[in-house]
């Protein structure tokens, strides 16, 4: 069965629109260099509005320390975290929430991430 994730949610209207059409996951980007970055307080407010929907909330992180990921996930009310950096398996294991690991399909080396202790994996096109 296919699952749909809409990432880069930055406002309540978009989040509610996703929930109303039964999107499976929505993503909040907590990487400050992203144009779709969202403040943790705004993400928390959106997640509180979504409490009566079955949609899963995902926090997207890039090379963040596990303690901060755990803190944000707990505060915001995330169901998953999605990791887009060069996290080692040891660091990934310190994260106390369901994990999605993203890897680049630029080379066969990206497949090494399948050895991580994650529930789901996703692949991205390589940045040029």
Indicate where each model-derived feature is located.
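Short beta-strand/loop segments at the ligand-binding rim of alpha/beta enzyme cores
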Residues: 1-4, 52-59, 96-104
């Amino acid at each position: 069965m296919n699952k749909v994730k809409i990432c880069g949610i930055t406002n309540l209207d978009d989040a509610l629109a996703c929930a109303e059409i039964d999107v499976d996951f929505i993503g909040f980007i907590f990487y400050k260099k992203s144009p779709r970055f969202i403040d943790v307080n705004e993400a928390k407010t959106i997640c509180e509005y979504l409490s009566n929907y079955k949609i899963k909330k995902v926090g997207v992180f890039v090379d963040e320390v596990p303690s901060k990921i755990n803190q944000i996930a707990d505060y915001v009310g995330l169901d998953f975290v999605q990791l887009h950096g060069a996290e080692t398996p040891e660091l990934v294991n310190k994260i106390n929430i369901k994990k999605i690991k993203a890897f680049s399909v630029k080379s066969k080396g990206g497949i090494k991430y399948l050895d991580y202790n994650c529930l789901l994996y996703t692949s991205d096109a390589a940045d040029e």
